Amino acid sequence: FIDKGEECAYFSKSTGLCIEVSTSLFSHESKAYGHLNKLFEDVFEKSIKINIDKIDILTLSHEQHLIYIVFHNMKHFLTGGFGIRQVADFSKYIETYGEYINWEKFWSDLKDLNYDTFALNLIEISLKYLGFNDDKITYPDNITSFDELKNSQKYYINSESLINDILDAGVFGASTMDRKHTALMTLDAVEDKKKSNRLKA
């Protein structure tokens, strides 16, 4: 058993199984993404029950789960990158649970934190490269077609640089020492920007 503050991990030496449990979704100390926990303060009130192997468990609501996937990808993007598997997790979650998601709430929550454009670029990558079916999505302003949304030019949707970064990153951005070093500078810049924005307010 390993206790790392906001994360606890169990590691079995005989099987190699590792189970991590986080006591918060994001580190409260992080200036870059600690504020994202605010969106999950009502997580227990909004939790849903699912049944796995005849056992009921509580989990995030479908909107909060998808928002968490977006935030988690951004967290890894800031700390070195994330792989195509994480984009597949995002698109597969939508394909599986999209009909249960309150899309208006989803987009509103993302827009409040300026993550809506990032999510739209993940959708574009999913459509272009992963055979993603977006028929369960209602886009912002009740738009039902991705092409219509992109042509409206209300959002910066140009996923070419992002997909190149994803493919270069490896699983979690640790493909090279240069990436790890650059990630530290990026995270530092984001934290400084958050600090200066708070000082202006």
Predicted features, each with a name:
Residues 1-201:
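Conserved NTP-donor binding/palm subdomain of two-metal-ion nucleotidyltransferases/polymerases, i.e.
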